[in-house]
Amino acid sequence: MIKSLLKSLLDDDEREVKKLRRTVEVINSLEAEFQELAEEEFPQKTGEFKERLKNGEELDDILPEAFALVREASQRVLGMRHFDVQLIGGMVLHQGRIAEMKTGEGKTLVATLPAYLNALEGKGVHIVTVNDYLAARDADWMGPVLEYCGLSVGLIVHGLSYEERKAAYACDVTYGTNNEMGFDYLRDNMVVSADNMVQRELHYAIIDEVDSILVDEARTPLIISGEGDKPTTLYYQIAKFIPRLRNEEDYKVDEKAHVVTLTEEGVKKVEKYFTIENLSENMELAHHVNQGLKAHSLMKRDRDYVIKDEQVIIVDEFTGRLMFGRRYSDGLHQAIEAKEGVKIEKESQTLATITFQNYFRMYHKLGGMTGTAKTEEEEFRKIYGMDVVSIPTHNPMIREDQADMVYRTEEGKFRAVVEDIISRHQAKQPVLVGTISVEKSEYLSAMLAKRGVKHQVLNAKYHEKEAQIIAQAGQEETVTIATNMAGRGTDIVLGEGIQELGGLYVLGTERHESRRIDNQLRGRSGRQGDPGESRFYVSLEDDLMRLFGSANVEGLMDRLGMDDDMPIEHKMISRAIESAQKKVEARNFSIRKNVLEYDDVINQQREVMYGERRKVLFGEDLKETVASMVDDVIEQAVERFAGEFKYSDEWDLPGFLSYIEQSIIPQPDFNQEDMRGMRKNEVVAFLAEKTQTLYEQREKEMGSEIMRELEKAILLRIIDEKWMDHIDAMDQLRNGISLRAYGQKDPLIEYKFEAFEAFQMMIESMKEDVVRYIFRVKVVQQPEERKTFENQGEEAEKKPVRVGKKIGRNDLCPCGSGKKYKKCCGRGVS
């Protein structure tokens, strides 16, 4: 009784799949009918489905016929017929859930089903993957199936012009990468003309490798930045000074928490070297020293980053790929550059930023697919509201997953790994060896070379050959050493006669801190019912065991008197490894959740700002908006100077008039005597009338058309400037807020409170600047006959078309035109 109850609780996936099989039967019953269709009838069917949706039918009503149509189109165009389990996967994606499908089960083909169905609504479908190669491959491969049914297919990859992007997003189905789509969203919120926006409303996205994008990349913000103006000399000074400090005595390293802290002795040395009295009062120096310590003691070359073409390039810890164009923030990247002696790039100023978590949560509906998601189901459910459904394989999975081999030392482990590889190599069985860093892959490669074993290395340094190396990895006598990248999205196909040798042997040289990454490595073998085998080798010196493992394991090995070359297989050790991984997974989830709680604050503010910006961008007549801002600024000025006094006689009238002249009405045609004896509301009415008269006068001088352009340009420019400064201020607030915990205050509540105050102040400051500019700028004719605006007040000349403070002249213009900044909005800007 209890067993059957437990089984029913555990088999949620089976129940879900069983339910969906009924719809599969309906789709299969339509197959013969759709096989009779002529080619020209496929687009006609699409038109018919769209009409039925307009007449009130739901997508679910059309689903069986839509899936049957796509299956038949795929059979004709590609010679590939969707299996029943692929139809189930397609339904799970359509429901806004995650389909966990093992490697080689045809996820790319599955995506065509929900993509076609949801594209019928005419609002666009995005199929998102992790890199340009996969996006282009999938669009070329699957696009013809959707086009056969009468849909348009677009592709978003790096390097496209603004026109190409706009056309791609206007298609029914758009393939692209998470990075490009996220950046396009940010760029759309920086353009100065509505025509330059490329994306439509975010309707439905299908994310391939969803765990990689929504979990591994969740903490990574997308940032558009301009060049900052902080000098770089301090980084060199600190890089020279750090080697004088001694670990434990001057600073302590906590690898688990990934932090370095100065001891009292260390603080004294810093103060002496930089000739300052109190380090705690010099926050900038303290921050830079801390980043320098991090760069020297926590960040390792060939593990966290590599040096390529005299540049520090980050290595993605989850995929092992080089992350070109990405930089560590907060001066850490500059600290690493100083440590390695390469050119230090200036710190940048953030113009716009968003995390993947918040970008993808803006879609009306989200579906995802991957080979490994079940271990992260709680996170998907809590953060994205998405369930994970395990889809059965088309053929039974017969790969043998062997127990871990545990060694006392890393050296002993690697000796055993080499012996295992040699014995498999002699038997001609292909071997895929997984390592967790560039450094470890090169160490193992040197050991194999010494023993004369021919092999290929696939790591961040050689990623250009990835597809070619992975394509060969299933051939006879092939040994491939790969970091975590191991070609996600590229199947390893077995060569002739390999099945008889036992299939591909996957050997993991270390357990990753996430069980999911280990499962991905195992999943390279045993695809589509092929035979295969996997085994992990572990040592007590591995990072996972050293930082999170149990001391009991080492005690057990001591008691058994085991030497370095003797492995141990014991349930207690397997449990200790799994327990260590669960600890790390829970910790990482907690960090991501905490990051999200903080990021949600700025995200809500971002949505408000971008919403207001779009109103300005699409607004034809902003006169009312500006007039309302003028009224607000007048009321605030009166409140500020009046205080509790009712009559103006009791105010500081000279100071009030001076403020009006500087911030609202330049060269007013009245004096303080004209306001004597007035109440607050009378002063407000008096000034409102004066500003209205001045506004009408300016409009008459300039003409209504130019005045409307002027309003839009000033509003956009000030919104962008204030938002950039606000992002910087919020970053600084967030970096310092953790110190509040020492004062027994909840840092998150404090952050929310102060962020709200900062946002309110930004809005007020924005209104003041708009009012100051609107009454002071005048149009001047430039030689190129471009309209710019000259400030009559104290401030320097301002050009509203310019979006960022320090965008490089050779950078692409953020307005989205696809031209260089100096040839576009930056023309004439020195």
From Swiss-Prot:
Coiled coil: none annotated. It comes from the Bacteria. ATP binds at residues 86, 104-108, 491. May bind 1 zinc ion per subunit. GO terms for cellular component: cell envelope Sec protein transport complex; cytosol; plasma membrane. SUPFAM superfamilies: Helical scaffold and wing domains of SecA (SSF81886), P-loop containing nucleoside triphosphate hydrolases (SSF52540), Pre-protein crosslinking domain of SecA (SSF81767). Its EC number is 7.4.2.8. It catalyses: ATP + H2O + cellular proteinSide 1 = ADP + phosphate + cellular proteinSide 2. Its cofactor is Zn(2+). This is Protein translocase subunit SecA. It comes from Syntrophomonas wolfei subsp. wolfei (strain DSM 2245B / Goettingen).
